[in-house]
Design a protein with these regions (language model features):
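Core nucleotide-handling region used for phosphoryl-transfer chemistry
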Residues: 2-473
Length: 473
């Protein structure tokens, strides 16, 4: 079927898409007559006995916002926000006389439409599913569609309208003094230093669950620890020089002028911090440019053409504020550490080389050994496993269910501290998860597998309206 109804927008976050799925497994939960545990799109979901094997459903990941129209048309807002539901009048008429019935006529979503991780009878439920027929209540034109042919399709737009997106808490006023500074900087005349094709952001790391079949059992994989900090990129690449008046005149009359030079560029996950030459340095989250602080230390060790991608953890420089609450990773108060996890090298012909995990690790170890002053600033990648995927759990049969079995073993592997406390931290926090890469892959990519305990902690922080530095940088 040619699908032009369910589409992915240009700015979509691939980890927060709705997916059309088929239920192919259900395991009865202990101490419950009506609840089942099912693995849907690679995630653990608790479902009721209203669902059955082979049902086609619509799945939404945790921390996704579902559009208000869909929630309203399906009466999915909670009793506290029932005024947003289509059946408002009916519920309002019986709300006081029969509160139990009124509650049965509504859902459990708050006004923000956020999908929250739930824990029932000791089991986590990682997302929200509904019947595929509910789409027709949202849009009548979706009634007579062959959904069998669309199983596995992911999307964030329906008929060109935004349907779901990543949830980000509203920033508290006390945390956003940088906005005024950014507005002022936009008014300044700026010189763009960036040479095309020299700088690249890090690729999006996809959730492993929905993509588990992309892992070939025979592939050489690396498994590394996922740290909970903020992403950073440090490059020594060709940049444009700001020409002197004399050089501008020479250039105007056709004389050769060297317009490029190697220069340091540093960035957060999505914002290049020193792309422009301005009269003022931009402020950042919490009022401190933590990426700039790290750049001051690491830049001089990066050779021409190299870009280092990594994670900054610990504390904001000279501050008692943590980059991520309680995730100290052994840092003393006021100090940070930087862990490189990816390195690329670009030559004079713009040909880019991707380093494998072992080369990244060796470069980091060499940097620390040759420069002891960096011992408390730079931390090496924590490689947990390197080898054929099929050799990690040799007791798993290489059958049609290998991928599903492999995923389930990874989720609870205590050798990787999955669902255990993070041993790298002094504070008691769960490990965030692991990252998997395929060595000598056709193109650079990686998959992440987060722990359920981390999802739960993240949800609690969102409930309190706490903003993650990674979500606004």
């Amino acid at each position: 079927m040619n699908n032009n109804i369910f589409t992915i927008s240009k700015d979509a976050n691939v980890n927060y898409l709705a997916t059309i799925c088929r239920i192919d497994n259900m395991t009865k939960m202990e101490n419950s007559d009506h609840l089942y545990l099912s693995i849907i799109n690679g995630f653990n979901i608790i479902i009721s006995d209203d669902f059955h094997i082979d049902n086609i459903v619509l799945y939404f990941p945790v921390e996704t916002i579902i559009c208000s129209k869909f929630l309203s048309k399906n009466n999915l807002y909670s009793i506290n926000d029932y005024d947003l539901n289509d059946n408002y009048s009916e519920v309002n008429a019986i709300k006081n006389a029969d509160p139990i019935k009124a509650k049965s006529m509504v859902g459990f979503f708050s006004r923000n439409g956020r999908v929250r991780i739930l824990k029932l009878r000791g089991q986590y439920s990682q997302g929200f599913i509904c019947r595929i027929e509910d789409l027709a209540k949202y849009d009548k034109s979706l009634k007579d569609i062959d959904y069998e042919s669309l199983v596995g399709i992911s999307f964030d737009e329906v008929n060109g309208e935004k349907f779901c997106w990543k949830y980000i808490p509203e920033e508290k006023k006390t945390l956003t003094p940088h906005k005024k500074v950014n507005r002022r900087n936009k008014k300044l005349k700026r010189f763009d230093r960036l040479v095309p094709e020299q700088f690249s952001y890090h690729y999006d790391t996809k959730q492993l669950g929905p993509a588990i079949h992309e892992i070939n059992p025979n592939a050489i994989i690396s498994i590394t620890t996922k740290l909970h900090g903020t992403s950073a990129i440090f490059s020594n690449i060709l940049t444009y020089r700001k020409l002197s008046l004399f050089e501008k005149i020479k250039n105007f009359f056709g004389f050769k002028v060297n317009k490029e030079e190697y220069g340091y560029v540093y960035s957060s996950r999505s914002v290049i911090k020193n792309r422009y030459i301005t009269k003022k340095d931009p402020k950042s989250f919490y009022g401190q440019d933590i990426w700039g602080k790290v750049a001051e230390v690491i830049n001089k060790y990066i050779p021409n053409g190299m870009t280092v991608y990594g994670e900054i953890v610990g504390y904001l420089d000279g501050s008692t504020t943590m980059i991520q609450k309680d995730h100290d990773y052994g840092c003393t108060v006021g100090c940070w550490k930087f862990m490189p996890y990816r390195i690329t090298q670009i030559d004079e012909n713009n040909d880019k080389t991707e380093w494998n995990v072992n080369l990244v690790y060796n470069w980091t170890i060499g940097l620390i050994n040759n420069h002891p002053e960096l011992k408390n600033r730079i931390m090496p990648l924590n490689i947990l496993y390197y080898g054929p995927a099929k050799d990690l759990y040799k007791d798993i049969e290489n059958s049609e269910h290998w991928h599903e079995d492999f995923l389930q073993r990874l989720k609870v592997d205590k050798n990787f501290y999955m669902e255990l406390d993070e041993p790298l931290c002094k504070h008691k926090v769960p490990r965030e998860g692991i990252v998997i890469r395929v060595e000598d892959d056709l193109f650079p990519r990686a998959w992440k597998l987060k722990t359920l305990r981390h999802y739960g902690k993240e949800a609690e922080q969102h409930d309190r309206g706490e903003v993650d530095i990674e979500e606004v940088s």
